[in-house]
């Protein structure tokens, strides 16, 4: 959406260079429906994840701390999703005022960064737990995990500030509607390109490279360990899990990141064609649905890689309350296999534990 502005009576009025871009009847029906599904599934699933980790698993492990914070970040975002559903169903007419516009927009940005940062830290933790279990024991503590999560929330909050500052309610004169949108006073401004590149690089590229590297090193270490033990089926299981984790992250976010970059080019006036603007504005909410639906499934996806999580999750669904006294040992490895390949790899007698165990 390319916008030009003027101010009257304290209300920002803008002109939309491509007023019909992204405005299709099927979008106004399909997207609110998808948002509603994401809201129901996400609230239900992430609430159960919080209950399982906090009340059943007792939040005793590093991985559970990251997973709990991941679910909480998703819940914060999901609470604002009904606003976006109504906004889209009303054909991009924002009825909730400027403050909720800023809060809802910041929540979307916050969830993006918090979730990606937490998944990145989770991959690093899995790498340390599997490949360097003894060396990392002193670093992989509950205190370090909690401090890391606090830092992540602060960083995500800082990354969301532009939404609080620059996202506002505007009145589009040539379409006679009120929207909640980003608007930049000058097309020569470096702000939109800076925000777009930050989202592309800090919100996707760097985290993806770290996640890819971490799980590649994990797979190599486990492959070596299982070759020593001649356990090929086990090695194949690990490879599939790791590939699923990496590809799940990649394909969830790539479409949204691509169209975010194109949207920046439109805002800067690099792209003038309204047909391209229409494609971008039409595709953007669809890519958001893909990215954030998968995002909200992440806690369940990662949690179900662990046998203990699955056990407690099924107990919760059957209304079986948590035991008053927690188990003395608790799996913390997510897709990590309580087996530690760096511990006496040459010992063929040592049998690896479940490859899907979440320590």
Curated annotation (Swiss-Prot):
Residue stretches spanning the membrane: 26-55, 62-89, 99-125, 142-165, 191-216, 240-268, 279-304
Keywords attached to this entry: Cell membrane, Disulfide bond, G-protein coupled receptor, Glycoprotein, Lipoprotein, Membrane, Palmitate, Phosphoprotein, Receptor, Transducer, Transmembrane, Transmembrane helix
Record-linked CDD domains: 7tmA_AT1R
GO terms for cellular component: basolateral plasma membrane; cytoplasm; dendrite; endosome; Golgi apparatus; organelle outer membrane; plasma membrane; recycling endosome
Extracellular compartment spans: 1-25, 90-98, 166-190, 269-278
InterPro entries on file: ATII_AT1_rcpt, ATII_rcpt, CCR1-9-like, GPCR_Rhodpsn, GPCR_Rhodpsn_7TM
Side of membrane Cytoplasmic, spans: 56-61, 126-141, 217-239, 305-359
Annotated lipid attachment (S-palmitoyl cysteine): 355
Top-level taxon of origin: Eukaryota
GO molecular function term, any single one: protein kinase binding
Glycosylation sites: 4, 176, 188
Paired cysteines (S-S): 18-274, 101-180
GO biological process, one term: regulation of vasoconstriction
PANTHER family noted in UniProt: CELL ADHESION MOLECULE, TYPE-1 ANGIOTENSIN II RECEPTOR A
Entry function: Receptor for angiotensin II, a vasoconstricting peptide, which acts as a key regulator of blood pressure and sodium retention by the kidney. The activated receptor in turn couples to G-alpha proteins G(q) (GNAQ, GNA11, GNA14 or GNA15) and thus activates phospholipase C and increases the cytosolic Ca(2+) concentrations, which in turn triggers cellular responses such as stimulation of protein kinase C.
Subunit structure of this chain's protein: Interacts with MAS1. Interacts with ARRB1. Interacts with FLNA (via filamin repeat 21); increases PKA-mediated phosphorylation of FLNA.
Similarity comment: Belongs to the G-protein coupled receptor 1 family.
The protein's name in its UniProt record: Type-1 angiotensin II receptor A
Organism: Mus musculus (Mouse)
Origin organism lineage: Eukaryota, Metazoa, Chordata, Craniata, Vertebrata
Gene symbol of the encoding locus: Agtr1a
């Amino acid at each position: 959406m390319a916008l030009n502005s003027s101010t009257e009576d304290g209300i920002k009025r803008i002109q939309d260079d491509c007023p019909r871009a992204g405005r299709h009847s099927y979008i106004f029906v399909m997207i609110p429906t998808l948002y509603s599904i994401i809201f129901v599934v996400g609230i239900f699933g992430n609430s159960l994840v919080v209950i399982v980790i906090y009340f059943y698993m007792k939040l005793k492990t590093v991985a559970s701390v990251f997973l709990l914070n991941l679910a909480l970040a998703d819940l914060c975002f999901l609470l604002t999703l009904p606003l976006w559903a109504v906004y889209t169903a009303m054909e991009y007419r924002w009825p909730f005022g400027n403050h909720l516009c800023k809060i809802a927009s910041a929540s979307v940005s916050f969830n993006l960064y918090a979730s990606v940062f937490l998944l990145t830290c989770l991959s690093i933790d899995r790498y340390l737990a599997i490949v360097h279990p003894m060396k990392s024991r002193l670093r992989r503590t509950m205190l370090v995990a909690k401090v890391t999560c606090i830092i992540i929330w602060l960083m995500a909050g800082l990354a969301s500030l532009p939404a609080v500052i620059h996202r506002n309610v505007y009145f589009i004169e040539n379409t006679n509607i009120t929207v909640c949108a980003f608007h930049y006073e000058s097309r020569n401004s470096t702000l939109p390109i800076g925000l777009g590149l930050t989202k592309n690089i800090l919100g996707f590229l760097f985290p993806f490279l770290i996640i890819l590297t971490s799980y590649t090193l994990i797979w190599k270490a486990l492959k070596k360990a299982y070759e020593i033990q001649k356990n090929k089926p086990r090695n194949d299981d690990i490879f599939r899990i790791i590939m699923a984790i990496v590809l799940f992250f990649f394909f969830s976010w790539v479409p949204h990141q691509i169209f975010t970059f194109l949207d920046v080019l439109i805002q800067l006036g690099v792209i003038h064609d309204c047909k391209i603007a229409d494609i971008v504005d039409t595709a953007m909410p669809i890519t958001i649905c893909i990215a954030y639906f998968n995002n909200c499934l992440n806690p369940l996806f990662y949690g179900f890689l662990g046998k203990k999580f699955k056990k407690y999750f099924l107990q919760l669904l059957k209304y079986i309350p948590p035991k008053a006294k927690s188990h003395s040992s608790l799996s913390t490895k997510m897709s990590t296999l309580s087996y530690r390949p760096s511990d006496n790899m040459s010992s063929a007698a040592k049998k690896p534990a479940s490859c899907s165990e979440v320590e």
